[in-house]
Amino acid sequence: MFYNNISVMIYKFFQVLLKISVRIYFKNKVIAGKNNIPKGKPVMFVANHPGAFMDPIVISSFCDRSLHYIARGESFKNRFAKWFFKKLHMIPVYRKEQTPELIHKNEAIFDACFKHFENGKSLIIFPEGTSKIEYRLRKVKSGAARIALGSEAENNFSLGLSIVPVGLTYSNPKNFRTDIQVNF
Protein backbone atom coordinates (compact mmCIF):
# COMPACT_ATOMS: atom_id res chain seq x y z
CA MET A 1 0.00 0.00 0.00
CA PHE A 2 2.71 2.46 1.04
CA TYR A 3 4.79 1.51 -2.02
CA ASN A 4 1.88 2.27 -4.35
CA ASN A 5 1.30 5.64 -2.67
CA ILE A 6 4.97 6.55 -3.16
CA SER A 7 4.75 5.54 -6.82
CA VAL A 8 1.68 7.72 -7.33
CA MET A 9 3.34 10.63 -5.53
CA ILE A 10 6.48 10.40 -7.67
CA TYR A 11 4.42 10.29 -10.87
CA LYS A 12 2.19 13.20 -9.82
CA PHE A 13 5.16 15.29 -8.69
CA PHE A 14 6.94 14.91 -12.02
CA GLN A 15 3.71 15.40 -13.93
CA VAL A 16 3.19 18.80 -12.29
CA LEU A 17 6.87 19.75 -12.58
CA LEU A 18 6.98 18.90 -16.28
CA LYS A 19 3.70 20.70 -17.04
CA ILE A 20 5.16 23.86 -15.54
CA SER A 21 8.43 23.33 -17.41
CA VAL A 22 6.69 22.95 -20.79
CA ARG A 23 4.67 26.11 -20.22
CA ILE A 24 7.89 28.01 -19.49
CA TYR A 25 10.06 26.35 -22.16
CA PHE A 26 7.80 27.10 -25.12
CA LYS A 27 6.81 30.67 -25.95
CA ASN A 28 3.73 30.02 -28.09
CA LYS A 29 1.64 26.91 -27.56
CA VAL A 30 -1.18 25.96 -29.92
CA ILE A 31 -3.20 23.00 -28.69
CA ALA A 32 -6.04 21.77 -30.89
CA GLY A 33 -8.51 18.90 -30.77
CA LYS A 34 -8.51 18.06 -27.05
CA ASN A 35 -12.23 17.45 -27.52
CA ASN A 36 -11.23 14.44 -29.68
CA ILE A 37 -9.93 12.62 -26.59
CA PRO A 38 -12.69 10.32 -25.31
CA LYS A 39 -13.37 10.26 -21.60
CA GLY A 40 -13.91 7.17 -19.49
CA LYS A 41 -12.32 4.63 -21.83
CA PRO A 42 -8.85 3.40 -22.72
CA VAL A 43 -6.97 5.48 -25.27
CA MET A 44 -3.85 4.81 -27.31
CA PHE A 45 -2.20 8.07 -28.31
CA VAL A 46 -0.20 7.53 -31.51
CA ALA A 47 2.20 10.39 -32.22
CA ASN A 48 4.96 11.43 -34.56
CA HIS A 49 8.36 11.70 -32.84
CA PRO A 50 10.30 14.83 -33.84
CA GLY A 51 11.50 15.99 -30.41
CA ALA A 52 13.00 12.95 -28.62
CA PHE A 53 12.39 13.07 -24.84
CA MET A 54 10.40 16.28 -25.23
CA ASP A 55 7.54 14.54 -27.09
CA PRO A 56 5.99 12.47 -24.26
CA ILE A 57 6.47 15.40 -21.88
CA VAL A 58 4.62 17.76 -24.23
CA ILE A 59 1.73 15.33 -24.80
CA SER A 60 1.41 14.68 -21.06
CA SER A 61 1.42 18.40 -20.34
CA PHE A 62 -1.67 19.01 -22.43
CA CYS A 63 -3.57 15.80 -21.72
CA ASP A 64 -5.73 15.59 -18.61
CA ARG A 65 -5.16 11.95 -17.71
CA SER A 66 -2.52 9.66 -16.31
CA LEU A 67 -0.48 8.20 -19.17
CA HIS A 68 1.85 5.27 -19.71
CA TYR A 69 4.63 5.48 -22.27
CA ILE A 70 6.30 3.00 -24.56
CA ALA A 71 10.02 3.73 -24.33
CA ARG A 72 13.25 2.45 -25.81
CA GLY A 73 14.29 -0.61 -23.81
CA GLU A 74 17.96 0.34 -23.90
CA SER A 75 17.14 3.22 -21.51
CA PHE A 76 16.30 0.69 -18.75
CA LYS A 77 19.78 -0.81 -18.47
CA ASN A 78 20.76 0.08 -14.92
CA ARG A 79 18.76 -0.66 -11.80
CA PHE A 80 18.05 2.97 -10.85
CA ALA A 81 16.91 3.93 -14.37
CA LYS A 82 14.61 0.91 -14.45
CA TRP A 83 13.11 1.79 -11.06
CA PHE A 84 12.75 5.50 -11.86
CA PHE A 85 11.30 5.04 -15.35
CA LYS A 86 8.70 2.61 -14.03
CA LYS A 87 7.62 5.26 -11.51
CA LEU A 88 7.11 7.59 -14.47
CA HIS A 89 4.90 4.93 -16.14
CA MET A 90 7.45 4.13 -18.83
CA ILE A 91 7.24 0.66 -20.38
CA PRO A 92 10.35 -0.71 -22.11
CA VAL A 93 10.12 -2.17 -25.58
CA TYR A 94 13.11 -3.85 -27.19
CA ARG A 95 14.21 -3.52 -30.79
CA LYS A 96 15.92 -6.30 -32.68
CA GLU A 97 18.44 -3.83 -34.12
CA GLN A 98 19.69 -2.67 -30.69
CA THR A 99 18.99 -5.53 -28.28
CA PRO A 100 18.24 -8.75 -30.18
CA GLU A 101 18.92 -10.80 -27.03
CA LEU A 102 16.00 -9.07 -25.25
CA ILE A 103 13.41 -9.02 -28.03
CA HIS A 104 11.67 -12.04 -26.44
CA LYS A 105 10.61 -9.78 -23.54
CA ASN A 106 8.28 -7.83 -25.81
CA GLU A 107 5.55 -10.48 -25.60
CA ALA A 108 5.23 -9.92 -21.84
CA ILE A 109 5.41 -6.16 -22.40
CA PHE A 110 2.60 -6.32 -24.95
CA ASP A 111 0.56 -8.36 -22.44
CA ALA A 112 1.16 -5.63 -19.84
CA CYS A 113 -0.10 -3.04 -22.35
CA PHE A 114 -3.23 -5.16 -22.92
CA LYS A 115 -3.84 -5.16 -19.14
CA HIS A 116 -3.38 -1.39 -18.97
CA PHE A 117 -6.11 -0.95 -21.56
CA GLU A 118 -8.37 -3.50 -19.83
CA ASN A 119 -8.03 -1.36 -16.69
CA GLY A 120 -9.07 1.76 -18.61
CA LYS A 121 -5.57 3.26 -18.72
CA SER A 122 -4.03 5.20 -21.59
CA LEU A 123 -0.77 4.76 -23.45
CA ILE A 124 1.44 6.88 -25.69
CA ILE A 125 3.35 5.19 -28.48
CA PHE A 126 5.58 6.66 -31.16
CA PRO A 127 5.27 4.24 -34.09
CA GLU A 128 8.19 5.79 -35.97
CA GLY A 129 10.31 4.11 -33.30
CA THR A 130 13.06 6.72 -33.34
CA SER A 131 13.17 10.46 -33.03
CA LYS A 132 14.48 12.83 -35.66
CA ILE A 133 13.78 16.52 -36.20
CA GLU A 134 12.01 16.44 -39.55
CA TYR A 135 8.81 18.00 -40.83
CA ARG A 136 7.44 14.74 -42.21
CA LEU A 137 6.18 11.43 -40.95
CA ARG A 138 8.78 8.69 -41.22
CA LYS A 139 8.18 5.00 -41.83
CA VAL A 140 6.15 3.50 -38.97
CA LYS A 141 6.75 0.21 -37.20
CA SER A 142 4.04 -2.35 -36.43
CA GLY A 143 4.05 -2.15 -32.60
CA ALA A 144 1.12 0.26 -32.23
CA ALA A 145 -1.11 -1.82 -34.49
CA ARG A 146 -0.06 -5.05 -32.79
CA ILE A 147 -0.79 -3.65 -29.33
CA ALA A 148 -4.16 -2.17 -30.35
CA LEU A 149 -5.35 -5.28 -32.19
CA GLY A 150 -3.93 -7.59 -29.52
CA SER A 151 -5.75 -5.67 -26.78
CA GLU A 152 -9.03 -5.92 -28.61
CA ALA A 153 -8.49 -9.60 -29.50
CA GLU A 154 -7.81 -10.41 -25.83
CA ASN A 155 -11.23 -8.88 -25.06
CA ASN A 156 -13.24 -10.40 -27.94
CA PHE A 157 -13.10 -7.04 -29.74
CA SER A 158 -15.34 -5.43 -27.11
CA LEU A 159 -12.76 -3.36 -25.23
CA GLY A 160 -13.64 -0.11 -27.00
CA LEU A 161 -10.04 1.07 -27.30
CA SER A 162 -9.83 4.48 -28.95
CA ILE A 163 -6.82 5.46 -31.02
CA VAL A 164 -6.10 9.19 -31.00
CA PRO A 165 -3.52 10.43 -33.50
CA VAL A 166 -1.29 13.21 -32.18
CA GLY A 167 0.64 15.59 -34.40
CA LEU A 168 3.58 17.44 -32.86
CA THR A 169 5.14 20.39 -34.66
CA TYR A 170 8.00 22.35 -33.14
CA SER A 171 9.57 25.49 -34.54
CA ASN A 172 12.78 24.15 -32.93
CA PRO A 173 12.53 21.69 -30.01
CA LYS A 174 16.15 22.24 -28.96
CA ASN A 175 15.87 25.99 -28.44
CA PHE A 176 14.34 27.74 -25.46
CA ARG A 177 11.21 29.92 -25.97
CA THR A 178 10.29 28.54 -29.38
CA ASP A 179 6.83 27.43 -30.54
CA ILE A 180 4.91 24.16 -30.27
CA GLN A 181 1.72 22.96 -31.89
CA VAL A 182 -0.08 19.85 -30.64
CA ASN A 183 -3.02 18.42 -32.59
CA PHE A 184 -5.10 15.66 -31.02
Model-assigned labels for residue ranges:
Residues 1-5:
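Short, positively charged and aromatic/hydrophobic N-terminal segments
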Residues 6-184:
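Soluble catalytic domains of membrane acyltransferases
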